[in-house]
Amino acid sequence: MIQQQTMLTVADNTGARKMMCIRVLGSSGRRYASLGDVIIGVVKDALPNMPVKKSDVVKAVVIRTVDTVRRPDGMCIRFDDNAAVIINNDGNPRGTRVFGPVARELREKNFTKIISLAPEVL
């Protein structure tokens, strides 16, 4: 469950390390984001000489959450951190690598490019 002011780890190689959620995209007044939801965030920590700089406002898709997500078959899934991948306006990832596992829920939301870059899909 990601809401405004939540700090997330950036799980790609765009140069950003930490970001803060400033808006959950969707219907008006939407409060929380879960796996596969798109958010707008600001980069709080970044590596030098990389495409994404500190204080850049970026779109990202949530790939891991600490909050438990229940699947239709009854299985519950939970991760150790809140993580996101920075995307462009077309929905494609800006980086060329994704670090760590991603949830299967991204495939249902048509983020297949992120699924193909991920080392493990849970």
UniProtKB/Swiss-Prot annotation:
InterPro entries the UniProt entry points to: Ribosomal_uL14, Ribosomal_uL14_bac-type, Ribosomal_uL14_CS, Ribosomal_uL14_sf
Assigned keywords, A-Z: Ribonucleoprotein, Ribosomal protein, RNA-binding, rRNA-binding
Cellular-component GO terms for this entry: cytosolic large ribosomal subunit
PROSITE patterns associated with the record: RIBOSOMAL_L14
Entries under Pfam families matching the protein: Ribosomal_L14
GO molecular function list: large ribosomal subunit rRNA binding; structural constituent of ribosome
Biological process annotations from GO: translation
Coiled coil spans: none
Family from the record: Belongs to the universal ribosomal protein uL14 family.
Subunit structure: Part of the 50S ribosomal subunit. Forms a cluster with proteins L3 and L19. In the 70S ribosome, L14 and L19 interact and together make contacts with the 16S rRNA in bridges B5 and B8.
Function recorded in the entry: Binds to 23S rRNA. Forms part of two intersubunit bridges in the 70S ribosome.
Name of the protein in its database record: Large ribosomal subunit protein uL14
Gene: rplN
